[in-house]
Amino acid sequence: MIGSSLFLDDPLLWKIAAGVALATSIGQAAAWRFDDGRGRLWLYGVAAVLASASIYVWIAGISWVFYVSSVPMPSTFRAACIAVAVTGTLFWMVTTARQVSAVLGKPEFIAQAFRDAGSEIQYSLSAMQQLSTLSNHCGPIARIGQGLVLFAALAVILAVRIWAPLPASADLLLFSTVLLTPGSLFFAGLAVKGILLMIVTPRRLERIHGKPVTLTDD
């Protein structure tokens, strides 16, 4: 397949991705083992965040990391692609964190998502969906900012293909980059949501109330 050799010529990236997958799998197993069936929410959160991080590494690796590392291009274009990808991802994560923090800062949401059951505080999985719904109702500035991030990342990558004398074999990587960049941003944001909702918040509630926060079925 045209361009498939570019995926195979750089074994270091595959080794890094495989190493991350192995490390996150070990981390997930350790979290489940440490929980020992008690259903502690923050340990479930650790496992979920590790899974999101592993998927993000694979998606980002298959998309823009392979593109900027394997395709021969001028150093200025390579630097521009890296800068846009890294800056855009960080901006996306910061924006997501602000949206989620705004929802978690509402006492009515905390009271609804985390129910005091006497000896423990119970959290329902439906709260994640409620959080996503509420956090997605962000202001127009945040929506425009996230839209510009996605547009800028794809525009720079496509502009490099137009202006730089890239080989035709790079088109497969270009296609995968354009296709998977939104997915990488989604999983980066999902990891941020998991950290704030399923790790930071339950740990804070456990310190305040002196009770474990557990995960329950809907």
Locate each region found by the language model:
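Hydrophobic membrane-targeting alpha-helices
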Residues: A29, G61-V65, R161, F187, ...
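Alpha-helical membrane-embedded segments
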Residues: A79-T96, F151-V156, L173-I195
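Transmembrane alpha-helical segments of integral membrane proteins
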Residues: V156-P167
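Juxtamembrane/interface segments at transmembrane-helix termini
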Residues: F34-R38, L90-Q112, F186-T214
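Membrane-proximal helix-loop-helix units in multi-pass membrane proteins
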Residues: S63-T133
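Loop-to-transmembrane boundary segments
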Residues: M1, Y44-S52, Y123-A155
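N-terminal first transmembrane alpha-helix
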Residues: M1-A85, S169-L180
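Cytosolic/matrix-facing juxtamembrane and C-terminal tails of multi-pass cellular membrane proteins
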Residues: A117-G139, L190-D218
